[in-house]
């Protein structure tokens, strides 16, 4: 959510107050921890113990983050948004937007189901196949239309594997023309991949306090006596949206 300068600071300025209460994923990149929480992003510098939040006001291109992943070879954090837009964040805080996939008009299902790193590349498993992102060059290198949804992918030996819950496991030799669907052959049954955060990174992330409200969902707000009162919620058990708890939040100064 965004509130105006009357609450947040100087006249004519804006400040985002995003929720970071629900930790979803933690990545380590150099001396920093990058934390995806409540679909928002912040980092923790282990050298000086500083916390930095990221949003559209201070550099990001979009909001509602779906996946993050650190690419060690390119020394960049890959940020994939729910609308399929992509940002690359380096360890100095510089952001490079890669909007090509987001802007590309396709008749297939573009939904990104997961991301996997190999060298300087990030492989996006999508609703139609795999998209290969060159993280170092900040460009889309290739797109492999397999005509089935891919849940996750990985490289092992001289092969790239595409795991699909609906179609099973497929693979192709890295030396083959991966654009040619006939080079992808069945390699077994689909196996659910369990992704768990490193316990030590999660434990440290739980000690951090980047601030912000409990929830990003605001149903009603009112400004009274230099305080911003708000109610969250919109919880729907049928939609299983537990990230929208019923809550009353009060902002005074910069503190919730």
Language model segments and positions:
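Bacterial Sec-dependent N-terminal signal peptides
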Residues: 1-13, 121, 159-161, 172
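Short coil-to-beta transitions that initiate beta-strands within beta-rich domains
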Residues: 7-29, 55-73, 98-118, 141-157, ...
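Conserved beta-propeller blade signature
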Residues: 32-35, 76-79, 121-124, 159-162, ...
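Beta-propeller domains
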Residues: 36-56
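Structural signature of WD-repeat beta-propellers
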Residues: 36-38, 81-82, 90, 125-127, ...
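Short glycine/acidic-enriched loop and turn motifs that connect beta-strands
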Residues: 41-42, 84-86, 129-131, 167-170, ...
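Short loop/turn segments that connect beta-strands within beta-propeller blades
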Residues: 45-49, 90-94, 134-138, 174-177, ...
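Short, conserved, GDST-rich strand-edge loop motifs in beta-rich repeat architectures
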Residues: 230-246
């Amino acid at each position: 959510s965004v509130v105006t300068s009357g609450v947040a600071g100087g006249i004519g300025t804006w400040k985002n107050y995003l929720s970071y209460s629900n930790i979803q994923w933690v990545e380590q990149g150099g001396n920093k921890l990058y934390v995806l929480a409540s679909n928002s992003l912040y980092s923790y510098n282990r050298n000086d113990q500083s916390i930095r939040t990221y949003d559209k006001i201070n550099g990001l291109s979009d909001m509602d983050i779906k996946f993050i992943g650190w690419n060690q070879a390119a020394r960049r954090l890959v940020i994939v948004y729910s609308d399929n837009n992509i940002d690359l964040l380096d360890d100095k805080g510089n952001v490079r937007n890669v909007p090509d996939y987001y802007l590309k008009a396709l008749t297939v299902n573009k939904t990104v189901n997961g991301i996997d790193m190999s060298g300087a590349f990030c492989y996006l498993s999508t609703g139609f196949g795999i998209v290969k992102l060159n993280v170092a060059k900040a460009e889309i290198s290739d797109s492999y239309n397999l005509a089935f949804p891919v849940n996750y992918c990985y490289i092992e030996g001289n092969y790239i594997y595409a795991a699909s819950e609906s179609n099973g496991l497929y693979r192709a030799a890295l030396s083959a023309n991966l654009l040619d669907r006939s080079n992808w052959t069945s390699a077994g049954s689909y196996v659910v991949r369990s992704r768990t955060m490193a316990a030590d990174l999660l434990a440290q992330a739980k000690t951090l306090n980047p601030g912000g409200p409990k929830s990003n969902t605001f149903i009603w707000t009112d400004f009274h006596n230099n305080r911003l009162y708000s109610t969250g919620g919109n919880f729907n058990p049928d939609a299983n949206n537990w990230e929208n708890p019923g809550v009353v939040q009060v902002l005074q100064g910069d503190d919730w």
